Amino acid sequence: MVPTGQVAEKQACEEPRQDRELKSWRWLVFYLCFFGFMAQLRPGESFITPYLLERNFTKEQVTNEIIPMLPYSHLAVLVPIFLLTDYLRYKPVLVLQCLSFVCVWLLLLLGTSVVHMQLMEVFYSITMAARIAYSSYIFSLVQPSRYQRMASYSRAAVLLGVFISSVLGQVLVTLGGISTYMLNCISLGFILFSLSLSLFLKRPKRSLFFNRSALVQGALPCELDQMHPGPGRPEPRKLERMLGTCRDSFLVRMLSELVKNVRQPQLRLWCLWWVFNSAGYYLITYYVHVLWKITDSRLNYNGAVDAASTLLSAITAFTAGFVNIRWALWSKLVIASVIAIQAGLVFCMFQIPDIWVCYVTFVLFRGAYQFLVPIATFQIASSLSKELCALVFGINTFLATALKTSITLVVSDKRGLGLQVHQQFRIYFMYFLTLSIICLAWAGLDGLRYYRRGRHQPLAQAQALSPLEDSVQAISLQDGDLRRPQPSAPQLLPEDGSVEDGRADLRVEAKA
């Protein structure tokens, strides 16, 4: 039996250590959020299209040669950057992102040819792919119980940075009379400062997939291990002899779990929305500034529109958190309605030759997309482990990038149809209209099945349990607990999404 004095002495020693740890992670989170804010301060980003046209690049070169390089290179670097982010434990990829931004703005300031601008797009695609490092980094700093709050802090820092950057750029251009060249010089200065901040970030000791040595040292197992603990885990050396490496075994189990979860109707639905709607959304944001310049070459309120759309996106995303309906029944109808609204807004963009209509419709278009992003995030994550969430979001992003790359190759690239921007927007309108009709027909079929079975009988889709829920229910029954299982919902943010949001110029993706 431990004497009372020794217990009190031990508790007295533990309290200062806990206070130091609390102050330490709070400082790390604050520093990371400050870095995320400063990394978004690029006031020249909203004015890149006017800048390129002032540098004597033609609208055809910008539309059919320079911009198409962005989705091509993004598709090429997406998977390598995703793997390197986890393997190198985040910090090196954040430094790489800042270095790539430096290269982007040096090429903008010093480049004189189409090839230089295409190389600029390649470096920008690296910054887009590297956004996953920022959103994932914060989860390695805190305990799972703090994920939701820390994710909101990091997201708010990014949105605030995008908003301030857009407002600053518009004020400098409209009131200060600063040229777009000088605006890009100011952006380069902010980027160099954010690069210096990235060098002092703490490199985590662990990551989600590759750096899992903490398991050997007695740390908590991953969520997949908790879901399927098995009869017992062999010693590390024995496991290495049996499977080669612990990493290979972990990835195999993840893929196996992913195959089981594919049968969930809600998961399939929202993943399909993510792929198809994201592809169309980013195609619009890539080319919308070219459309504005053609509609009215005199007015230049790109920064103000970016700021307004960012603010509305934050409001709609916040509002989505309070929507409480039976998603198993109404998901398809909600998706169809939002996509139909997007189709109507795209139609107004290219059909009504008024720059203010173009501005307003784009702000509403971004807000409509951002309204469904948090809903889709929760619907996908609500019955998956944290590891599977990261994998599913990565696959969704890759498929969306592949789709928009294919559309770009056919519609925009000079080696394809090489259409002008108004013709492209007409095709994008048909794209969103087709998606809305498909979703509406799908929702109608579900509604007919629902009323044929009787209003008081739930849909079969809503009754299906995910593998995670099955495992939780099995464990509950074994323990004699007959209560209904309540699967946890890990709070993960997509690439974000950043916020995969955007630069409302050639590459609004970095601000979404």
UniProtKB/Swiss-Prot annotation:
Residues 500-512 have a biased composition (Basic and acidic residues). The modification Phosphoserine is found at S466, S471, S476. It is a multi-pass membrane protein. InterPro entries: Folate_carrier, MFS_trans_sf, SLC19A1. Pfam families: Folate_carrier (PF01770). The modification N-acetylmethionine is found at M1. Expressed in liver, heart, brain, spleen, lung and skeletal muscle. Residues 479-512 are annotated as: Disordered. It comes from the Eukaryota. GO terms for cellular component: apical plasma membrane; basolateral plasma membrane; brush border membrane; plasma membrane. It is found in: Cell membrane; Apical cell membrane; Basolateral cell membrane. Residues 1-29, 86-89, 138-151, 201-266, 324-329, 378-391, 449-512 are cytoplasmic. GO terms for molecular function: 2',3'-cyclic GMP-AMP binding; antiporter activity; cyclic-GMP-AMP transmembrane transporter activity; folate:monoatomic anion antiporter activity; folic acid binding; folic acid transmembrane transporter activity; methotrexate transmembrane transporter activity; organic anion transmembrane transporter activity. Its main location: membrane. Glycans are attached at N56. Residues 400-412 are annotated as: Required for substrate-binding. Folate binds at I48, T49, E121, R131, V162, Y281, Y282, Y286, R366, Q370. The chain crosses the membrane at residues 30-50, 63-85, 90-110, 115-137, 152-176, 182-200, 267-292, 301-323, 330-350, 354-377, 392-415, 424-448. One of its GO terms (biological process) is folate transmembrane transport. It catalyses: 5-amino-1-(5-phospho-beta-D-ribosyl)imidazole-4-carboxamide(in) + (6S)-5-methyl-5,6,7,8-tetrahydrofolate(out) = 5-amino-1-(5-phospho-beta-D-ribosyl)imidazole-4-carboxamide(out) + (6S)-5-methyl-5,6,7,8-tetrahydrofolate(in). Antiporter that mediates the import of reduced folates, driven by the export of organic anions. Also acts as an importer of immunoreactive cyclic dinucleotides, but with a lower transporter activity. Mechanistically, acts as a secondary active transporter, which exports intracellular organic anions down their concentration gradients to facilitate the uptake of its substrates. Has high affinity for N5-methyltetrahydrofolate, the predominant circulating form of folate. Also mediates the import of antifolate drug methotrexate. This is Reduced folate transporter. The lineage of its organism: Eukaryota, Metazoa, Chordata, Craniata, Vertebrata.
